[in-house]
Amino acid sequence: MYLVITKSYPPEVGGMQNLMWGLTNSLSKYFMIKVFADYQDQHQNYDKEVSFSIERIGGIKLLRKYRKAHLVNEFIKNNKNIEGIISDHWKSLELIKTNKKKICLIHSKEINHNEGTSLNKRVLNILNNVDHVISNSEYTKNLAINCGVNSSKITVINPGVNPAKELNKKTIKEAENLLKNKSPRLITVSRLDKRKNHEKIIMALRNLKQTYPNIIYTCIGDGDEEENLKQLVKELGLDEQVLFLKKISQDLKNTLVAKSNIFVMPSIFYKKSVEGFGIAFIEAAQYGIPSIGGKDGGAADAIEHQKNGLICDGNSLDEIYSSINDLLNDKKYLEYGKIAKENSTKFYWDKIIEKYKKILN
């Protein structure tokens, strides 16, 4: 049996949550799995779907880490068939007392602390004493090595996706009503925060509008930058070109992606935060939609430059504008989109899980 300790798990929404849900579901086909996850409202809707055990830990957030560690330690003490522990975050392993095999996933931001600081020392104390460190991209692997993690412990395994669901007629109609026959169509699905760089996409849109007066940019997500971005759209007179949506169904989100031409997310460094991988690029690729990503972070693991999309400098407005214009010119996005769709299958969970099996076996 393998124990999975996670801070990020459905029904909470996000890339990390999707990763841990996909990983545990896929692992359970080959191993006995027990998950220790944070309590979430309506978790029963998810927990009843699976064949493995999920233990939810509630209470005050500050004390939850200690309660979870106590439960895990007690479970290990009372069960002799534990083969190892898989954790989504180094902090989840700090209080675990066992000699069993330990595997820790790393994503980028959570390990990015200056050398010699107390946080850096805590990170290294955990990661250099586990059996395996799983990095979500080559970028994150190099970041970990630069932070002092032993390179021999690190294996790169990109996050997986499940095959895309077929679109249904009802949501296709709903999406087309929202898009109002406008074209070309750009889209971003992410939190609205500084790192995702929506601001520069909107600024590039002002120039693109001169060539493509019917262009539309759909922003799906919410976050701290929402009001600032809406104000920018108003100031630039782009109300007819930008569509903000949040808290929509997964089906509608997928349909809006599938009915777009280019997925745009040229992420940048912001403080300590950086894009570790970018699973949203793969989710778009499944529908034949090419992506434009930023050179900062791990987007290059998902986007092959000038094959299934473009990598640009997210700090350069000119590069973002040129990249979008390049893909729209002669509808080059169709050619890149075809390659993106073919390439996306290598990220299916049934292939990704084989890499985990090699480590666990």
Locations of the language-model features?
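Short His-centered aromatic/hydrophobic patch
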Residues: 86-92
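A short, well-ordered alpha-helix in the C-terminal region of glycosyltransferases
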Residues: 184, 214, 241, 319, ...
